């Protein structure tokens, strides 16, 4: 079995297939595995992320997460007010009703309108509109009585965290489904865990170690130039150096803009499955990691309103020294930040950090990293859902996976892992 792409989706599929005794080779054009998750910040884990927790457990990383406490979700509003969303250990819907009632980030009027909407939703009177996937989230929130202050503050901050874009750029349907899954389905669902490690240390290292134990072959710095097809099957892949590989099954774990150029033009033009990939677009991401000479007692996640960066994570530096801490500053959907110099991005991150985590004296930076991704995640625009492909393609031995495929989730870590699992299951079901 040949897997194109060594990101999380491809590695998850490789793990599932190799665990069942199949011979698997992973092709990665980069110098390392992990794709966009290489050097990514700590994952924001909710109980609703079932596929992610399944992978964590299979890798033995639940030993890391088990002792971790709930990480409160904080909002730093443009007024300077700090609001915390309460995690209440109560059964659903009581936890949702009480949590919404007590949440100070929304005015009493906004809370009342939200509770009225939730009550109608639970009773399905009236049923939810059928066109939410094609509507803009900002317009939909207005229609259920959310004020401009609420939309530009709390809801916009959540939209950037969960879907990677502001309200005016995302699908109302996907936003509502994600909110419901993450925050409105019981006390366990709202428990939030942020491990004090980046994705590479927390997931990629143990995942790579397990793949090596299972005998999965990894080919790094290997650039595929073309996927070759017969009338109903993939027959081989050709590399830039003209060498070729064949397999019984092929699974793509590439982003759409890298997959399409590998396909013959006749395949792209003939099959709507591949043709519609051109309708998908991606959003940029900028991440600044600051290693500081200031200790942190616990992990914090704070959403920022009206700042350069949209949220920050601070956690103790458990990998190097307990008297230091690490701060991650993230900005999504802001292409204007990409050409900024490294020094300027670090300065902007320090400015936002001073507001998010005020101290008597500015901490000293021990070291830092800046990551710029022009195409980081699928843009969740209205109407995008209909163009996200399922795992099974028109060709019997060719599967397509990735966070951007149709998983029901935004293009996040959960979506990547779930798509990899589904791709592996689709292959196993036919063997």
Give each language-model segment a name.
Residues 20, 222-327, 331-343, 351-356, ...:
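Mid-domain catalytic core of redox enzymes
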Residues 33-48, 116-117, 121-125:
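Glycine-rich active-site loop/strand segments that organize a redox cofactor
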Residues 178-241, 245, 249:
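Helical element adjacent to the flavin cofactor pocket in flavoenzyme catalytic cores
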């Amino acid at each position: 079995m040949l897997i194109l792409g060594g990101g999380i989706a491809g590695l998850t599929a490789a793990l599932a297939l190799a665990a069942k005794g199949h011979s698997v080779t992973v092709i990665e054009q980069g110098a390392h595995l992990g794709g966009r998750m290489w050097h990514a910040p700590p994952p924001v884990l909710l109980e609703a992320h079932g596929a992610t927790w399944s992978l964590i457990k299979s890798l033995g990383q639940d030993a890391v997460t088990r002792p971790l406490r709930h990480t409160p979700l904080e909002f730093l509003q443009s007024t300077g007010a700090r609001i915390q969303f309460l995690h209440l250990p109560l059964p659903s819907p009581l936890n949702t009703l009480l949590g919404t009632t007590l949440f100070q980030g929304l005015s009493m009027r906004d809370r009342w309108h939200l509770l009225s909407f939730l009550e109608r939703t639970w009773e399905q009177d009236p049923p939810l509109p059928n066109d939410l996937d094609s509507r803009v989230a900002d317009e939909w929130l207005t229609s259920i009585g959310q004020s401009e202050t609420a939309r530009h503050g709390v809801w916009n901050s959540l939209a950037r965290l969960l879907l990677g874009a502001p309200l005016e750029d995302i699908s109302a349907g996907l936003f509502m489904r994600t909110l419901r899954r993450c925050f409105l389905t019981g006390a366990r669902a709202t428990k939030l865990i942020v491990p004090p490690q980046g994705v590479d240390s927390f997931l990629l290292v143990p995942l790579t170690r397990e793949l090596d134990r299972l005998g999965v072959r990894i080919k790094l710095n290997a650039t595929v130039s073309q996927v070759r097809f017969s009338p109903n099957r993939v027959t081989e892949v050709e590399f830039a150096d003209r060498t070729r590989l064949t397999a019984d099954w092929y699974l793509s774990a590439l982003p759409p803009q890298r997959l399409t150029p590998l396909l013959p033009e006749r395949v792209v033009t003939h099959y709507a499955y591949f043709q519609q990939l051109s309708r998908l677009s991606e959003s940029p991401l900028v991440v600044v990691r600051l290693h500081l000479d200031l200790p942190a007692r616990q992990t914090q996640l704070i959403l920022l309103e009206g700042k350069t960066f949209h949220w920050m994570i601070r956690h103790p530096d458990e990998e190097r020294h307990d008297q230091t801490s690490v701060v991650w500053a993230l900005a999504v959907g802001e292409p204007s930040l990409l050409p900024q110099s490294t020094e300027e991005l670090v300065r902007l991150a320090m400015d936002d950090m001073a507001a998010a985590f005020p101290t008597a004296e500015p901490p000293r930076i021990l070291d830092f990293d800046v990551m710029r991704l022009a195409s980081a995640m699928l843009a969740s625009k209205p109407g995008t859902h209909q163009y996200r492909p399922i795992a099974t393609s028109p060709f019997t031995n060719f599967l397509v996976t990735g966070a951007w495929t149709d998983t029901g989730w935004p293009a996040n870590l959960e979506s990547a892992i779930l798509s990899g699992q589904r791709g592996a299951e689709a292959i196993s079901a036919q063997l």
